[in-house]
Amino acid sequence: MSVSESHDIQLVIITGMSGAGKTVAIQSFEDLGYFCVDNLPPSLLPKFLELMKESNSKMSKVALVMDLRGREFFDRLIEALDEMAENPWITPRILFLDAKDSILVTRYKETRRSHPLAATGLPLEGIALERELLEELKGRSQIIYDTSDMKPRDLREKIVKHFATNQGETFTVNVMSFGFKYGIPIDADLVFDVRFLPNPYYIESMRPLTGKDKEVSSYVMKWNETQKFNEKLIDLLSFMLPSYKREGKSQVVIAIGCTGGQHRSVTLAENLADYFKKDYYTHVTHRDIEKRSRK
């Protein structure tokens, strides 16, 4: 389903339960070329849109995250939505992200964060209050996603499919680094083993670092065999990806593995994603980068 172009500004308001995936959502819209604002106070929404209209901005696609922290914010957002309904140059949509209570509690425990509305620190208390506050807004939402069984990549792909303005944006290249010692990713379409490359792990100063650090990536990429492999891999994928897309595949998961998923695979995955992002919607993840604690 494509976004209509019948109005000047296509507006997506991202809201929903805390922990349901709003951060992933706003990042996905940013990758789709939306002008994104996180946590804009509802009282500023009408003025913000007026300023965009008056500035003759070419930013016709806007995505906003609206987090509710109390009844006052909620009431003001409802008023702002009513005001927007009278503006013919705005096409507003509300994307509501939800998840089961048990899943939200688990996510809060994993991140060790407190629910913003939990006065006592108990997640279920905040979740119950938030559901009550958001009930009317959920009823007004045009799009509702239950992210209970979604990984971040699944949510990204769903958003891309729904909001992409052309067919090319619906094909996703997911690049993943991993460590063979933790197993090969079961959802990988293509797996490449880079354990033959020189390993920074054996250099003491680089051991606690990862392939996202400049010192490590420079070391990995300085070798002739790394450069040749990277060149051949890009050449191979440049041939394969258009064929995958032509066959109607919505995404390709490219997994690059080294021993622990910290250095070589991370460097190559970052390079690969950076190269292909000019032609495809590209997302990079490092599955095992947090498995080993830094010292």
Curated annotation (Swiss-Prot):
Q: Which UniProt keywords apply?
A: ATP-binding, GTP-binding, Nucleotide-binding
InterPro entries according to UniProt: P-loop_NTPase (IPR027417), RapZ-like (IPR005337), RapZ-like_N (IPR053930), RapZ_C (IPR053931)
**Membrane-spanning ranges:** none
**SUPFAM superfamilies hit by this protein:** P-loop containing nucleoside triphosphate hydrolases
Gene inactivation phenotype reads: Cells lacking this gene show a reduction in transformation efficiency and in fraction of cells that express competence.
Please describe what this protein does: Displays ATPase and GTPase activities. Can also hydrolyze pNPP. May affect the expression of competence via the phosphorylation of a cellular component.
Name under which the protein is recorded: Nucleotide-binding protein YvcJ
Organism in which the protein naturally occurs: Bacillus subtilis (strain 168)
Task: Report the gene name.
Answer: yvcJ
